[in-house]
Structures are given as C-alpha cells and as structure tokens.
C-alpha cells in the first residue's frame, strides 16, 4: 500500500458540493455549486438548470438517447413512491395529483398536439387529462418526436426534423409577426403559443459549437423553417410555447409562495444567472420580455425585486425598443443603447 501523506489526503478530499433551489418549480430550478478548497473562501457558482433542461427538449434525439440503451428502465412512478417533480418531468411522467404548476387543457392545445403528432396524440395527451404540467407535455411530445412511445418507450418512427437537428448544440428561439413578416415579441401572451396559429409564429435556428481549430463539416446555422415541407416544424414551436407557459406559471406561483422565497434570501447572485438564461426565451412572451428589459435598465438585487416587477409590471416604465440581428444573436436596443442580447440556448448534442 502506497504511503499517503497529509497533502495527498487533502487533495483527495472532495471539496465541492451542490444543492438545488426551487425544485418544486420545474422551469425555475437553480443549481448552486460550492467549492470549499480555497482557504477561508467558499466559491459559489449558480446556473439556471431548470431552463437548461427544458430547452433540451428542442433536440429530442440527443435528450433521450439514454432511453434507447438496451435494458433501460424508467424509475417507477406510483402513488406510494412518487418521484421528485424534476425527475418525473424528465421521464415524461405527469403528477397523479393536482398541483400549482399545471395548466388547464384547452381545445386549442389538443388541436395543437394532434397537428404535431397525428398518430400518437392520444398517448401524448389522453382525453381524460384535464390539467397537465406544460413541461411534462413538452417532454412527452419530444419523446415521440425522438421515436419513442411516451408510455412504454417502444421505438417508433422519429420525426425527420429531429434527425436533422440531432447533432446541433444550441438553438436561437425567435418570434415573428406574420402580418408584417418581421421579428417581433409575442405580444399576445404565452398562452397564445399553445394554439396552431400561435406555435406557427415561432422560428428556431439551430447552430453548432466550433472551438479552436476543431472543424465540423456542417453549416454554422440550420433553420428547419427553410427546409422542404416534409420536415415538420410545428412541434418545435409547440415545445417552445410550453416552456414559456411553464415559466410564466412558475413565476406566478413563486410570487405567492413566501416559504420558497425565503430560501433565496441567502443567494442574491442567483438572480443574475437566472435572468441571463431567461433572455434566451424573452421573445416568447411580452411579460418575459418586459422583465428582461427591466433587469437591463436596473438589475434586480434579489429575487424579491424580480417578483415585484413580475407582479406589477407598471413599476418599471420601459422605453421603446427595437430588435436587430447581430451575428448569432438578437440585439435588443432602447434609448440608443444595447439593453441585452437574446442568445442561443445550449441544447446538448449527440
């Protein structure tokens, strides 16, 4: 046995730990990673993992590739042993009981799911379901697009578009005004995106990460909307719309939950990490866009300040803004200066 001195033992000791905040709000979950290796110093890194996990549904094959492994079994989800909300959503389960993160199923939403997956729409959204978590529905739709039955994981035919974007690593989510044919902010609210007409106004541009001298034989950006009609794109707009609705629902519920708000009082830097990630979804909803502009004008000091503006948008008067394409992102300009950029969200990759 090799001799272990004190230095070896110290180096071998795990000096990092992680914890999750807002686990009961699937799109708002924030992961805190703390490293205590520094003397008298705890370094904390915050990341908005809830939104990151939600965005990965836009690349179904990469997101669910582990489910194709032989012998893979999903964790059991029963009333006696309920799964944590995060784990349940990632596996396409829906809660057996009502909770505040759910929305009511409307005829427009059923029609949208039927248009996205004509053959398996009844499995994705059963007729008996009247309330559902938007992210659970997005996961089930994404699983079907990846070629997996959302109930038993039996392999089916994947959507051709999911094959096209499988090796991409990021996506820029855009909204357009169909009447004027230009980039715009969805002014009708996120709920409008859960209809066929609303989801059709969402465009997605997929891209590849190129680091250093690594060259990939692929274009810098891929827009499924420019592909032939045999590549369906409505499901991409539906998934993006469900993410936006989940964000609005969770922010509304967090504003009324004082207990969860108290858990954030010791983590003021978490707000900045959350807002940076939220900017990728800013064009999907006028409420989300207003929140991002307000943060750009005067950064929120903590989550309580963010929720005050969310609940009372009139507290912050925002200037007239314009959108401009700047390289791989969308620049939001106001008062003659750049307020923030709508950047591409990472979506994993094969």
From Swiss-Prot:
UniProt-recorded Gene Ontology molecular function terms: RNA-directed RNA polymerase activity; single-stranded RNA binding
The keyword RNA-binding appears for this protein: yes
Keyword terms of this UniProt record: RNA-binding
Family membership: Belongs to the aquareoviridae NS2 protein family.
SUBUNIT field: Homomultimer.
Its biological purpose: Protein that binds to ssRNA and may be involved in genome packaging.
Protein name: Non-structural protein 2
Record lineage: Viruses, Riboviria, Orthornavirae, Duplornaviricota, Resentoviricetes
Gene: S9
């Amino acid at each position: 046995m090799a001799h272990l001195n004190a230095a070896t033992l110290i180096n071998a000791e795990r000096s990092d730990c992680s914890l999750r905040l807002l686990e009961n709000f699937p799109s708002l979950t924030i992961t805190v990673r703390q490293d205590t290796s520094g003397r008298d110093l705890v370094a904390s890194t915050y990341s908005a993992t809830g939104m990151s996990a939600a965005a990965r549904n836009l690349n179904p094959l990469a997101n669910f590739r582990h489910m194709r492994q032989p012998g893979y079994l999903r964790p059991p989800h029963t009333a006696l042993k309920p799964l944590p909300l995060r784990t349940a959503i990632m596996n396409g389960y829906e809660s057996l009981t009502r909770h505040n993160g759910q929305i009511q199923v409307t005829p427009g939403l059923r029609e949208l799911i039927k248009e996205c997956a004509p053959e398996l729409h009844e499995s994705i959204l059963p007729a008996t379901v009247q309330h559902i978590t938007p992210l659970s529905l997005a996961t089930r739709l994404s699983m079907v697009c990846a070629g997996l039955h959302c109930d038993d994981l039996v392999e089916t035919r994947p959507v051709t578009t999911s094959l096209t974007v499988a090796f991409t690593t990021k996506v820029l989510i855009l909204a357009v005004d169909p009447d004027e044919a230009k980039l715009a902010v969805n002014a009708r609210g996120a709920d409008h995106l859960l209809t066929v007409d609303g989801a059709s106004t969402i465009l997605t541009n997929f891209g590849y990460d190129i680091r250093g001298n690594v060259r990939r034989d692929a274009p810098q950006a891929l827009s499924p909307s420019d592909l032939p009609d045999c590549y369906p794109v409505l499901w991409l707009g539906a998934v993006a719309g469900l993410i936006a609705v989940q964000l609005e629902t969770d922010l509304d519920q967090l504003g009324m939950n004082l207990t969860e708000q108290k858990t954030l009082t010791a983590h003021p830097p978490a707000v900045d990490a959350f807002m940076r990630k939220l900017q990728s979804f800013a064009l999907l909803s006028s409420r989300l866009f207003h929140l991002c502009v307000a943060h750009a004008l005067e950064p929120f000091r903590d989550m309580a300040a963010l929720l005050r503006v969310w609940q009372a948008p009139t507290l912050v008067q925002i200037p007239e803004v314009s959108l401009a394409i700047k390289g791989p992102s969308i620049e939001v300009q106001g008062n003659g200066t750049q307020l923030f950029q709508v950047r591409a969200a990472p979506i994993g990759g094969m």
